[in-house]
């Protein structure tokens, strides 16, 4: 298998979740071994998508340095991962990626419009060789070796609408588009005022967020899936793991995980060189490796 980039440049416009301002986004092809690069056109500043460049994980995954930052990258990163794109430049004219409808389906549509192009370099994946786990009390995220990568995610909220939900996701592009990509971000009505007092969630609305009260969902159309909440957490986790620079070939398990725990997990993986192996798919014929890109 070869590395992939986009066949052509595509453009889009959306609202920023936290600042509520219109944002222009452009996805551009990049040459082999470039990785995923964010570029803020208003600052003339580039940020490689990697754990080392993450500066905040409070409400979203944020890349940055002393020049500035780019927030809420995880939904776009998730779609890029699902499509097997290895090299792409993401141009933004603001400090966050647009939220679109709160899921990653709009980014999937942009990638469909762009198409893919094979590059003259072998695709590489990160194969997990031993268990790596990060805990915070009873919350944890874990990567373990596997023959067929899956995500097993459980969430538990003290809320009658959400409660406890679990979902097991088996990696493939088709499975992602059908079962994960349309799952929207969510928030609680009781938190809205506090967030907005901190200049956060200013662009949040029923058009891009599932808003949950104590015992009801405020969105008139309801849920897209009965377990949309945990599916969105899987969407986020895929995006966060993409910061490792490769499709991760390992089982990811989470109980009440978060952007912060995912970030700590990626750092722990990179810290232990015995925990993973970078495998070139040009040198292997194992169908299990190729299956995840189907």
Curated annotation (Swiss-Prot):
Zn(2+) binds at residues 75, 232, 236. Keywords: Hydrolase, Lipid A biosynthesis, Lipid biosynthesis, Lipid metabolism, Metal-binding, Zinc. Pfam families: LpxC. Disulfide bonds: none annotated. The keyword Lipid biosynthesis applies. The active site is at 259 (proton donor). GO terms for molecular function: metal ion binding; UDP-3-O-acyl-N-acetylglucosamine deacetylase activity. It is an enzyme of class 3 (hydrolase). Its cofactor is Zn(2+). Pathway: Glycolipid biosynthesis; lipid IV(A) biosynthesis; lipid IV(A) from (3R)-3-hydroxytetradecanoyl-[acyl-carrier-protein] and UDP-N-acetyl-alpha-D-glucosamine: step 2/6. One of its GO terms (biological process) is lipid A biosynthetic process. It catalyses: a UDP-3-O-[(3R)-3-hydroxyacyl]-N-acetyl-alpha-D-glucosamine + H2O = a UDP-3-O-[(3R)-3-hydroxyacyl]-alpha-D-glucosamine + acetate. Belongs to the LpxC family. This is UDP-3-O-acyl-N-acetylglucosamine deacetylase. The gene is lpxC.
